[in-house]
Amino acid sequence: MVKAPKHANPAPHRDRLKKSPTGIDGFDEITEGGLPKGRVTLISGGTGSGKTLLGLDFLINGVIKYHEPGVFMSFEESEDEIYQDLASLNLDLRALVLKKVIRFEHVILERLEIQEKGDFNLEGLFIRLELAIDSIGAKRVVLDSIESLFAGIVDGGILRLEIKRLFTWLKHKQVTAVITGEQWQNSFTRHGLEEFISDCIILLDNRVRQQVSTRRIRVIKYRGSNHGTNEYPFVIDKEGLSVIPITATGLDHPGTAEKVSTGIPSLDNLFKGGGYTRGSTVLISGTAGTGKTSLAAAFTDASCRRGESCLYLSYEESPGQLIQNMSSIAFNLEEWAQKGLLKIVSTRPAFFGLETHLLDLYKLLAEVKPRAVVIRSESVV
């Protein structure tokens, strides 16, 4: 993924805020390293926005990528319900729980247990949470969700005191904590108190425009750290949650004078040095039937003949139809596909939003590692 732009005059290393990387594609770029280490982050959003999944991604990646055990404490869904929710994703939470590197705690908040009393406190919760943390040496904690935890308290004074005490207790345990909360009309949580004492606030949004769902993520607040300030698209697929830091992309890639053949010798002669410039973007424009696909096929064939892998994204034809049509003008694309030099991916553009198509492209680039990419046709995306 891309790197966030560097800031001038960074703070001395000893003074910089330590961070816990999430391992989520793109997210660590816009937060410049992840979530604040040893502090509390509030994840806010509406129903179905991805709050719980972001927390689970944070825990699972923490174990797999950074060897940091974690605790997931749910005040809503049971352990089996969470496992079922993750069944369609490549996130094997159950295996990590069995290995005792993630501790799952389902806290059932009976109304009789949470009553409005002058001496109400969270000592019972602290004891249970401390036992879970200490039993596996957890470095990361997720509480899902804070509305359910404090649902039985209506006294504002008690509520404010207990929320502050919870956040202070988590910091004292020196764990990196994530707390989820439902976004309300004029605040990031139902109570509107957590946002003031959270060190970091992440807002998730899921909106529908022109019958296409689009997910957005934004860093609202991050004490002691620079961060991307824009809204960034993100998607949820079988790999979990992935962020596309489009507006954080830096223009720092190197230039080159190297040329590559168009696949048509007479066309190469029209370019100074012969052919397209390596690393450049070439737009082939024209009305229907003017040969746009043929020019793209010529370039694809030439790239494969040089032994360079090529990725062909088709939004109009299936792989079989493309191969058949191009064989009529002597381009044997099937040969290159069988040799593993050419990967053709066809998708109907109306099935997904632009963000999903872009993320798919990111992942295909990482998988195929092509030297050449052909997109046919960008106008229908």
Locations of regions flagged by a protein language model:
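Substrate-engagement module of ASCE P-loop NTPases
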Residues: L129-A132, G152-I153, I158-Q183, A288
